[in-house]
Every structure is written in C-alpha cells, then in structure tokens.
Amino acid sequence: MADIIPNISIDVALFGFKGIKLEVLLIKRDKKPEMDQWSLPGGYVYMDESIKDAAKRRLKELTGITKLYLSQIALFGDTNRYPTRRLVSVLFCALIKPEQFKLIAGSDAKDVEWFKVSELGKLPFDHNEMISTAMLWFKNEIWREPIFINLLPEKFPLNQMQNLFTQFLGEAIDNRNFRKKVISQELVEKLNEKTKGGQQRPAFLYKLKRTI
C-alpha cells in the first residue's frame, strides 16, 4: 500500500433529488474520532494518486458509488478543524439521481444513507460548513451551467424543476418569471403529455433539451 500524504485529505458532498427535497449522502463513521457519527465521505490521499482520484477512490470504498464527475470547489484549512492534528481538506461535490446507484457501505463506514439537507443536525468537524459551501457553489452556477441535468427525471412538470431550483437558491421563485426564464434560455422542451393522477390539475410535462 502506498504511503499517504500527511496532513491532506478529501471530502465529498454528494447531492441527490428524489422529486421533493434535496438530500446529501452521509456515512456512519466506523473509526475515531467521531465514531458512530454521520459525516461526509472522505479520507486521505496516497502519494501515487491525484487529489481527484483519491476522492473517487474513497467514494467507492465508503459508499460503492463509482463513475462520477466530481467538481473540486473549496479548500478547508482552519487550524482547529480536526481534533488530533493539523489537517487540510479538499472539498469535491457532485449531483446524482439516487435511484441509479446502489449504496454499499465499506471500508471504515458502518452505514451509508441519504439525509434531507433541510433537516440536517450538527455534523462532525466542519462538514456543515462544507455542505453550505457546496450549496452556495451550486447556487452561483445554477443559471450558468445546467448542473441540474443529473437530478431531474426524463420527463417532469415545470413545478418540479422550480422546486429544485428553489432549494439551491434558498428563496422562493415567482412562477411566471421562472417559466419565462427557462423557456427563453431554451433549457427545456414542452411535450404533448400531461401529468396523471394526484389531486392537482394535470400539468404539461417537459424534458431537458438534448443540446444541454
């Protein structure tokens, strides 16, 4: 086994959307410090691998998830962020459809589960701050890049897309303005189909344009 790079680690904030609430993937730690606490998946970097490869490796070892595009978005280096020694962490993030991946806890993870971002309690280390940082990064990118493409189903009503945007932006969006903006930017294509069932009036379905 290759030696690790001392004092450098990675953490991954992985978000999923099941149609209603935005969720983040956490592992139940099987080692000290913070044994049995839920935290972001992460770990050390080997001397013979890149930072991003370390993030992909640890995500696979801890959760079973593979073949993701990870964005490197921030560096966390407060002197007291880790209890036993000075440790700098590189934060990566990604968006996925949870139903497309089978979760398998491994390595030093006892369990792995999705948690609603809006209902998170206090997490170990600075992981709450990491999640907030990732959310802010997505907020700044959401109109510039179609990052939401990995979260929406193939067909969806516009209110589902609007709900997703609202959770990233952290504020309510006017229905008419939202509809006008996504159509003017040619992000979606209207289908000749409507939602079925439920108590609400049927709404037209849309799909993301293939050019995205």
Where are these regions (language model features)?
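Conserved helix-adjacent loop modules within structured domains
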Residues: 145-154, 168
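Short helix-coil junctions and helix-kink-helix linkers
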Residues: 163-172
